[in-house]
């Protein structure tokens, strides 16, 4: 995986940061957020302009196949890898704050479906969910219909030409607002890419 750390974070080893686990889309891997998405530059600029709080961003590979099973395109064991391997590793090797209030999970396309699934399964572990061009909204909808703990905020975004996804997001946001879950929707120019 790749891990973004804020500029100067090594200067004060006692300082701890919130963490965002960020998943890629279909046909990509963890390098997409750095090479195509330029996440490191975007984060540096947002932090410098005081538009984003300092945080650590962890970008791992979605494709965690289950040993002994046929390798299917939809990663079957991502949730286990995230909860049992990735989060414990990050929390012991990087200066992150621990606990639900300091941990968020987001993804693009397929990564958004995986993020929503993991947040639904582990609501005590994540305070925020981000779905960018989310293709599977089933788990996101469960967030507002289940009685279990809800994320503090759910952020949706999509391209202006993703009309079906946009309508689905609007329906879910309405349900989330009714269940008193903060839901933010942004539409950016374009289609199904890093808008």
Predicted regions mapped to residue ranges:
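Non-catalytic cap/lid and distal C-terminal segments of serine-dependent acyl enzymes
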Residues: 1-195
């Amino acid at each position: 995986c790749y891990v973004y750390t804020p500029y100067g974070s090594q200067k004060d080893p006692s300082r701890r940061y919130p963490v965002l686990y960020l998943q890629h889309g279909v046909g990509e891997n963890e390098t997409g957020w750095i090479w195509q998405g330029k996440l490191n530059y975007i984060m540096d600029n947002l932090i410098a302009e005081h538009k984003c709080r300092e945080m650590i961003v962890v970008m791992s590979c979605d494709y965690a196949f289950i040993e002994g099973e046929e390798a299917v395109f939809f990663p079957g064991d991502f949730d286990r890898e995230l909860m049992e391997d990735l989060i414990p590793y990050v929390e012991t090797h990087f200066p992150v704050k621990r606990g639900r209030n300091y941990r968020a999970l987001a993804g693009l396309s397929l990564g958004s479906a995986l993020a929503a699934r993991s947040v639904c399964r582990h609501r005590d572990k994540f305070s925020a969910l981000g779905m960018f061009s989310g293709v599977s909204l089933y788990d996101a909808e469960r967030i507002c219909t289940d009685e279990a703990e809800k994320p503090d905020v759910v952020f949706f975004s999509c391209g202006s030409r993703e009309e079906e996804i946009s309508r689905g997001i609007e329906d879910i946001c309405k349900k989330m607002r009714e269940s008193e879950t903060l839901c933010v929707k942004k539409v950016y120019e374009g289609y199904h890419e890093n808008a």
